[in-house]
Amino acid sequence: MGNTVAMILAGGQGTRLGVLTERIAKPAVPFGGKYRLIDFTLSNCVNSGIYRVGVLTQYRPHVLSKHIGIGRPWDLDRKDGGVEILPPYVGRHESDWYKGTANAVYQNLEFLEENDAELVLILSGDHVYAMNYNDLIDYHLLKEADGTIACMEVPIEEASRFGIMITDVDGRIVDFEEKPAKPRSNLASLGIYVFNYEFLKKVLIEDENDPNSSHDFGKDVIPRILRENLGSLYAFRFDGYWRDVGTLRSYWEANLELVLPVPPFNLYDPNWRFFTHTEEMPPAYVAPGSKVSTSLVSEGAEVYGNVFNSVIFQGVKIGRGTVVKNSVIMTRTEIGENCYLENVIIAENVKIGSNVRMGVGEDAESKLDPKVYSGLLTVVGMNSVIPDDMVIGKNCVIGIGVRPEDFKSKTLESGDYVIVREE
């Protein structure tokens, strides 16, 4: 099938995830009790036998770069091939940063040359899915295509969030529009492409020299290939599980789907394992008298209270008499005694005092940003401390690094927020 090199676009800011991505890139966001979002794409690569991988970073890359390291958890610490972090070649000007997804790959054509790329697999590092990329590549070769885009049908009311394509009866793409206001189809791009290298190189160089281009695959490169008939593009229909967890609501829902009796996304398939870089921790402990049901509880967690329909990450401690419902609690967060938390997302290393009630009260629109904070979820940023006896409503936001003295009273009404700005 030719020498395939994967390029993972991992520079996304993920602004719709609010405080969860204020200090880290979206692909580094924790997910599913022990993983980070990029783990799924990296694992798909190695499970598909693809061991030449470039990770293109940009926004807040430190946590992501540290997480990937030399790639050992994914068997990517190799002399021949392996994983390489590819930041932008930043000079003295901000314009030296990646200007778009196409420009990011263009800036790394030398990496592709060094790895003797014949096929280039372009992937997003912030989606949750399991895909054997060989199926995509086999289809691409069968069609003798210049490029192939993985796609799936989505509800027509959601189609304007995606790149939307129209195909002929043979699966060849005849039209493509990025996030159309009035979509003419519901066949959505998954942001997963395979290109013949020489073809990709040619169109990227041409795009780079186009002063009117924003240098993005979906907005510029794909439409131009079709408009000017530069090559053949085909649609590969994927019928497996795929989630774009780009909003707080979709992130929360995708986590809680994992606890269903028959989860739509299978973390337990021995033939398609997901790998990650985590700290070694002892087994989880559930104390006498505690109740845990329909939940994921990761290693190192200590549960002295009650947990229902929730995802509990590594090293989390839940105090006696505390109830956690429909929530996502991230690594090393500690919750005191006699608390009640419902419909909350708590980031890493948060300390919650005793007798705290969170996610309660009347419904209310967010006073901070209704476009980001909606769906009545209360969100707490990393490294915050919430004092004893607080009552925090629905759809509230506690920012990163908030301290007890930052709260003006013991009550935070639904829709309200406490944010401490960086110095």
Swiss-Prot record:
DNA-binding as UniProt keyword: no
EC nos: 2.7.7.27
Pathway annotation: Glycan biosynthesis; glycogen biosynthesis
Amino-acid positions noted as binding alpha-D-glucose 1-phosphate in the UniProt annotation, renumbered to this chain: 98, 163, 178-179, 189
GO molecular function list: ATP binding; glucose-1-phosphate adenylyltransferase activity
PANTHER family in alphabetical order: GLUCOSE-1-PHOSPHATE ADENYLYLTRANSFERASE, GLUCOSE-1-PHOSPHATE ADENYLYLTRANSFERASE-RELATED
Binding partners and assembly: Homotetramer.
Record function comment: Involved in the biosynthesis of ADP-glucose, a building block required for the elongation reactions to produce glycogen. Catalyzes the reaction between ATP and alpha-D-glucose 1-phosphate (G1P) to produce pyrophosphate and ADP-Glc.
This protein's name: Glucose-1-phosphate adenylyltransferase
Organism: Thermotoga maritima (strain ATCC 43589 / DSM 3109 / JCM 10099 / NBRC 100826 / MSB8)
Gene: glgC
